[in-house]
Amino acid sequence: PQSLGDCHLGGGSHVLACGDNVAADMLDWLYPERPVQESEGELRRFDQSEFAVKGLADTGYVFVPETCDAGGCPVTVALHGCQMNDEAIGDTFARYSGLNRWAEEHGQIILYPQTESSMANPQACWDWWGFAESTWQINPLHDTREGTQAKALMAMVERLQEAPDAPAEESTQEAD
């Protein structure tokens, strides 16, 4: 798109490398007091099926620095955009968003849950409009803490805070 100017490095318009480290800028703002503690880490696939709710894929990703293997690290949840799930772009968002590099330096786990496309949600978006519940509900819950996807995300975070290795299924190659 023209709005991107000359910034087309790194792929399509979903994940670009434009000389700015937006992930680090955002996380430094959110966590200004996090000390730097360099550590290697790995991007892992994990089985999301136990958190099964309408719209979630069977597999997600989690990035865990070595310093977080024993638990006790904060968790940041990174939700992909529409048409950015694993089925559409593979692990591109989880691998190249820039979040993993920051997480390695600051001892933070990054959770990349994944959605799936369906007839009700062909672009695999997160449920911001209510496709996962009855459209006839008087007080819809999809955009509250009581929504099915929000509850599943919180269950994933709680599991990771207990033991980051628990939901891990398999390791992928080292991530950026």
Where on the chain are the PLM-derived regions?
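Catalytic histidine neighborhood in serine/cysteine hydrolases
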Residues: 1-8
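Short beta-strand element of the alpha/beta-hydrolase
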Residues: 62, 71-83
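Short amphipathic alpha-helix adjacent to the substrate-entry channel of hydrolases
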Residues: 90-108
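N-terminal cap/lid segment of alpha/beta-hydrolase-fold proteins
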Residues: 16-24, 28-70, 142-145
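Stable alpha-helical elements in mature extracytoplasmic
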Residues: 19-26, 95, 99, 149-153
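Cap/lid segment of the alpha/beta-hydrolase catalytic domain
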Residues: 4, 85-89, 111-163
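Surface-exposed acidic, glycine-flexible loop patches that form ligand/cofactor-binding
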Residues: 35-36, 64-71, 99-103, 162-167
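Loop/turn elements at helix/coil->beta-strand transitions in domains of secreted/extracellular proteins
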Residues: 71-75, 105-111
